[in-house]
């Protein structure tokens, strides 16, 4: 075990888990689970996500960065590019004390993009990760994921697919920059926001955001339903290489969004 891994494991052992862990699943037994990033420098990402408020945790051999509602996983790998240009353009978090968080980011030298709204903007993460931020003083925790933003050519079709497959609730989600609402599908843990793209964007595999993870209770039964509905299952039920209590599978949506289905990702 190298020094960086040892430090990460020690921090994980001492860390107090962030409020709860993942959201209570919906009627389809699905909730947001994780976001998996392919990165050039794991240590740089550990530093970045710590600055965002993440806490290192371990599920046996699986190192993760925990936020309320989601785990961030990082893996060293070559990529085809950042999030912009892929069907998943960015994802977003809300901070209870945004001015304090922004002061920390500025001290660390991270690039911040804002318009006239002091309560909203974007931060440029390593490897072309685009992260949206907003302030929400009503939060019960310091920071929480609030959405993943997808850009299909056909928004109603994508809404219908995620509603049927993941049991999400379609509607409008209100954001700082869109008070009238953005088309979305609500999944426990976060909104899947959807905006129309004039062209078909790149699929996520091989990008810095390689895939989105959803935690599923009773994964074998869920996969049987996926087969019956004709969902593209790219990898069937498989034991995890990192945790004996976890099993995984992979599916892909019709727009090229790679998704990992997990059961047992939480420590």
Residues of each region from the PLM?
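Bacterial N-terminal signal peptides
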Residues: 5-18
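N-terminal secretory signal peptides that target proteins for export/translocation
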Residues: 1-2
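N-terminal post-signal-peptidase region of extra-cytosolic proteins
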Residues: 74-77
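Vicinal oxygen chelate
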Residues: 20-27, 30-40, 63-66, 81-150, 172-197, 214, ...
